[in-house]
Structure formats: C-alpha cells, structure tokens
C-alpha cells in the first residue's frame, strides 16, 4: 500500500472531529484559521519540493545519472573501492540532490556490478543509506527535515554548515568498521557508453542558480524560499523552450557529422530523439510522497490544535533536558518516519538554542539510518535490492551505526 493512503484518510478523520468539536463550542473561526495555516505550510513545502523533483527528473532524463553510473561501473574498481566510492558520492551528492534519489542511483551501481554477491550488496546498501542520510542532514536541499527547519526560520542557511563535520563523522565511523568486512576481490567489469543528452550540464547549472535564488529570497528579501524556487522553475521552462526551438538545427548538425563519419548507430539514435518537455518532468514527481506530506502536515496540525502535542512538548522539552529530548527524536525517527517526527517538533515550537535546533535536525535526519525502515532511502533500497538488502541484514549493523553518534553530541552541544 502506498504510504499516502492511510495518512490522507487519517487527516480527513481528524479534521472532521475538529470541525464537529469546535462547532459545538461556536469556535468554527478558530478551526478554520488553523486549517488555513496548515494548508499554507503544506503549499510552501509542496511547491518547493515540486521544483526540486522536477530538476532531478530533468537531469535524469538528460542521462546525467546514467552517465555517472556507467563511468563508475566501467572503471573496474574492486569491492572495497566500490564500497567507499558509492558511499562517498552518496554523501557528496545528497546535499544537492535529495537523499532518496542519491541512494537509488548508488544502489543501481552496486546491483549492476555485484548483484550476485548478496553479502557485499547488503553492506554497500547500508553504507549508502548512512551516507545519503548524513549528507542530507547539513543541507536544506538534502533532506525534508532539514528543509522544514530552514523554512521555519529556526536556523539560517549558513548556520547549517557546522553540521558538516558531525555528519561526516556519523558516516565515516560505521563505514570504516563495515569496510573491514568487505572482500578484497574484484567484480566483473561491464563497459557501457552513455552519451549525455543536449543541455544536461546547463540544467545542472540552472539548478545551482535556482538554489542560489531561493537562498537569496530568504536571506535578502526575507521571503519564503519557495518563491525563489518557483522563479527557478521558470529558468528551466525557458531553457526547455530554447531546447525545443533549436532541436531541428541541432539534429541536422549531428546527422551531418554522423553521415560524414559513417556512424549508422548515431543516425538511428537521432531518429528517436524526443523534445524536452518541462511539464512531463513535473508530472513524474513523486506524487505519493507529496500527498504523504499533506497527510502528515494536516494530521500533526490537527493533533496540535486538539492539544496533544502540547502535552508531549511539556514532557520532552520542560521535564527533560532538551539535548536528551532531541536525541530521543533521532531514536524515534528510526522507528517512525522522520518527517512526521520533525514536523511534530516544529509544531510544538519549543524554546531552544540554535545548537539544539541543529542537534534535532541532525538526529532526525540521520536517526533513520539505525533501521532500514527509518528513512525513505532505506525503504527504497529494500525494494531495489530485494532479498539482498533486508531489515534484519541492516539490523545486525545497528550497534556499529550507533557508534557514529558517540563523537557527535559534544561537537553539537559545544
């Protein structure tokens, strides 16, 4: 069952209860104002993620990820090098792309090179999940939880950078220990040539420009970052228009070169070129995920209005030390999806220092690495490497993953 279905139903039931209860006390205006507030929060998140997903889909359609995958597969790396390379790239790419896309890309490389070695696949997938979650924790563009903290205004964009070292430690410590169990042999090399489609590199530059625009709107104009992201979507739309208008000239030029070189394969490939369509990229966004976020926002917002989150907040952030409360948020993120957990914390809005907001951002972001079901990356990889990367295969390494947290607390709290 898709994850959006139960939360959409739950959101509807909660707000029916709210509507009935507040009507009994003649406070329909209070319920309506709360509903509109939650809808606005969701709209900002929806449009922001829609633009980011559209850019990722555009890069995928232009064969950027396929080219990276072919390069890695064709290099003939040994298992140990492949283990470190896929993990390192997951850590580096996830702050720009989202951690789910990054994890799936690296998993595809692992499966193509060593799909017949289940022990290595399991270790490599665990490593990728840890790296992708850790890499996404120090960038608002790498993880939904980090994005929500930034959009809420608790931490400025530049203030996330102190999370880089703790995130790196959180990845490197378990990776170093797991690498000891990776075989020293080499898998069979597969050579595959992938040609980038026209405009691939320029779309990457436009995505970087879009990120800069979103940050500028937030830092300089004090507008929500989503306004800058929507402007960035216009960059892609105009570039898509340019690609379509110049397609005929580009094909004629490439066809002439193919004829001159006697390359029949290139001519055949040119005949199947499909014009770039931005709106098709929009339609291929992860709509189940986007609808899931709606359910989460509305469920948590409803429970907050009914007073349940205030009770939890009084226990966690009044009776407990905020540091340990935030550590528990990370542990809870391993069992429950980290998005509703973080949104609940943001809705509670406890009075905390910037250091504690950074701590809860890190723990919620990387806490999901403790279990395979704790993050979208882990769940997706269990499907991509079905039967080889499993819940219990990941669970065996949970104590090792937890060691990555030990050096992190003093760094953040200090």
Curated annotation (Swiss-Prot):
GO CC aspect terms: plasma membrane
A Pfam family hit: CitMHS
UniProt key word Transmembrane: yes
Single annotated GO MF: antiporter activity
Keywords: Antiport, Cell inner membrane, Cell membrane, Ion transport, Membrane, Sodium, Sodium transport, Transmembrane, Transmembrane helix, Transport
InterPro entries for this protein: Cit_transptr-like_dom, Na(+)/H(+)_antiporter_NhaD, NhaD-like
pH profile of the protein: Optimum pH is 8.5-9.0. Inactive at pH 7.0 or 7.5.
Membrane-topology annotation of the record: Multi-pass membrane protein
Main location as per UniProt: membrane
Localization per record: Cell inner membrane
Keyword Transmembrane helix: yes
GO biological process: sodium ion transport
Residues passing through the membrane, by range: 6-26, 39-59, 77-97, 120-140, 162-182, 203-223, 224-244, 289-309, 327-347, 364-384, 392-412
Cited function: Na(+)/H(+) antiporter that extrudes sodium in exchange for external protons. Can also transport lithium.
Family of this protein: Belongs to the NhaD Na(+)/H(+) (TC 2.A.62) antiporter family.
Entry-linked NCBIfam families: NhaD, NhaD_1
Name listed for the protein in its UniProt record: Na(+)/H(+) antiporter NhaD
Taxonomic source organism: Vibrio parahaemolyticus
Gene behind this protein: nhaD
């Amino acid at each position: 069952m898709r994850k959006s279905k139960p939360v959409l139903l739950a959101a509807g039931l909660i707000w029916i209860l709210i509507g009935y209860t507040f009507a009994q006390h003649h406070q329909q205006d209070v319920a309506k104002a709360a509903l509109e507030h939650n809808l606005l929060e969701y709209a900002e998140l929806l449009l922001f993620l829609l633009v980011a997903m559209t850019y990722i889909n555009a890069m995928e359609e232009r064969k950027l990820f396929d080219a990276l995958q072919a390069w890695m597969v064709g290099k003939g790396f040994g298992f140990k090098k492949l283990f470190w390379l896929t993990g390192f790239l997951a850590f580096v790419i996830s702050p720009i792309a989202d951690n789910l896309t990054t994890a799936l890309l690296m998993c595809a490389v692992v499966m193509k090179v060593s799909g017949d070695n289940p022990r290595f696949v399991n270790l490599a997938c665990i490593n990728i999940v840890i790296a992708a979650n850790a890499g996404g924790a120090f960038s608002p563009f790498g993880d939904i939880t980090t994005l929500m903290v930034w959009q809420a205004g608790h931490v400025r964009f530049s203030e996330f950078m102190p999370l880089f070292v703790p995130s790196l430690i959180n990845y490197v410590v378990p990776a170093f220990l797991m690498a000891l169990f990776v075989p020293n042999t080499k898998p069979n090399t597969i050579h595959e040539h992938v040609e980038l489609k026209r405009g691939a590199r320029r779309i990457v530059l436009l995505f970087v420009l879009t990120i800069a625009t979103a940050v500028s709107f937030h830092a300089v104009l004090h507008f929500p970052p989503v306004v800058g992201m929507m402007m960035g979507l216009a960059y892609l739309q105009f570039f898509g228009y340019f690609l379509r208008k110049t397609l005929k000239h580009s094909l004629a030029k490439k066809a002439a070169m193919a004829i001159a070189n006697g390359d029949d394969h290139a001519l055949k490939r040119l005949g199947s070129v499909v014009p770039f369509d931005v709106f098709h990229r929009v339609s291929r966004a992860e709509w189940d995920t986007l609808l899931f976020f709606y359910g989460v926002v509305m469920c948590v917002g409803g429970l907050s209005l009914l007073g349940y989150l205030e009770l939890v907040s009084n226990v966690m952030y009044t009776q407990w030390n905020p540091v340990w409360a935030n550590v528990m948020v990370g542990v809870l993120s391993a069992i429950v999806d980290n998005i509703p957990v973080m949104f609940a914390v943001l809705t509670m809005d406890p009075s905390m220092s910037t250091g504690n907001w950074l701590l809860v951002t890190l723990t919620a972001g990387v806490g999901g690495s403790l279990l395979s079901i704790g993050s979208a990356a882990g769940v997706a990889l269990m499907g991509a490497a079905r039967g080889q990367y499993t819940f219990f295969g990941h669970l065996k390494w949970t104590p090792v993953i937890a060691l990555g947290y030990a050096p992190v607390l003093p760094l953040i709290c200090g």
